[in-house]
């Protein structure tokens, strides 16, 4: 092997971050002899929050480790379900549908469609929320408390990926999908003036957001939402069993 190269084996789960030409078992990466292993991994395209372990000759090392070119290096993906200090999240501006679905099942999700990258990182750090994004550059920003790349182009796939990765505690029908506030049961008489005539005639059970005042009921789309909740419960239950 050329002494100026490292032989790095990335776990297959991380190949999506690599250029297509580099998606194979052993990758030869030019090395200047001084950079940290974390820098080498990120330069190859893999954000460090997606890395579960770094192994050099079978031994775990930290991202600050400076490798010797003869050492075989293995980069492993985060193990699922990932254990995190907090099951609270903040989502970037492109994941609005995912935010609403997570709130539907009771996950604490901060989301605004007008925050720039600096504001997202500040909120993640201040509130100790896991930043969920599909912006790889954002995950490579220094000082980010904790982040994760969301896999999938469709909201269904993104939803499944987040639940599979974190297996957060679920509490369906307890959060406002619009603002993340908590819902509280409310008598029909208290909200009757806010309802359309058809809704007043057809439904009797309501809840209201304690933050924004939005009123909820199990309406025409209720069966579809029930399916989403049931699917989420199955995914989290399966992952919780895997963790024990």
What does each of the following model-derived ranges do?
Residues 78, 82-105, 223-236:
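Extended interfacial segments that mediate partner engagement and assembly in macromolecular machines
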Residues 176-179, 209-212:
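Short cysteine-rich clusters marking metal-coordination/redox-active sites
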Residues 64, 193-206:
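Short linker/helix segments within small regulatory modules
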Residues 181-185, 217:
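Short functional micro-motifs and their immediate structural scaffolds
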Residues 12-15, 93-97, 133-138:
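Short, polar loop motifs at secondary-structure junctions
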Residues 170-174, 201-204:
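Flanking scaffold residues of small Cys/His-coordinated metal-binding clusters
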Residues 115-129, 138-139:
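BRCT (BRCA1 C-terminal) domain core and associated BRCT-interaction motifs
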């Amino acid at each position: 092997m050329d002494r100026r190269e490292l032989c790095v084996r990335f776990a297959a789960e991380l190949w999506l971050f690599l250029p297509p030409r580099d998606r194979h078992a052993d990758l030869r990466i030019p090395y200047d002899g001084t950079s940290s292993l974390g820098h080498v991994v990120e330069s190859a395209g893999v954000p460090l929050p997606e890395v579960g372990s770094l192994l050099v000759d079978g031994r775990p090392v930290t991202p600050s480790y400076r490798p010797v070119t003869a050492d075989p290096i293995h980069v492993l993906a985060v193990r699922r379900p990932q254990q995190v200090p907090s099951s609270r999240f903040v989502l970037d501006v492109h994941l609005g549908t995912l935010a609403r679905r997570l709130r539907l099942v009771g996950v604490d999700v901060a989301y605004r469609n007008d925050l720039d990258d600096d504001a997202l990182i500040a909120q993640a750090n201040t509130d100790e929320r896991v930043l969920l994004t599909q912006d790889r550059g954002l995950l490579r920003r220094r000082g980010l408390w904790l982040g994760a790349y969301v896999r999938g182009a469709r909201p269904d796939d993104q939803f499944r990926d987040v639940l599979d990765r974190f297996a957060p505690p679920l509490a369906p029908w307890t959060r406002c999908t619009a603002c993340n506030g908590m819902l509280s049961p409310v008598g029909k008489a208290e909200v009757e003036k806010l309802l359309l005539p058809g809704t007043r005639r057809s439904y009797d059970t309501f809840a209201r957001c304690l933050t924004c005042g939005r009123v909820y009921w199990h309406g025409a789309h209720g069966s579809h939402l029930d399916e989403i909740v049931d699917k989420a419960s199955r995914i989290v239950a399966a992952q919780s069993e895997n963790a024990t």
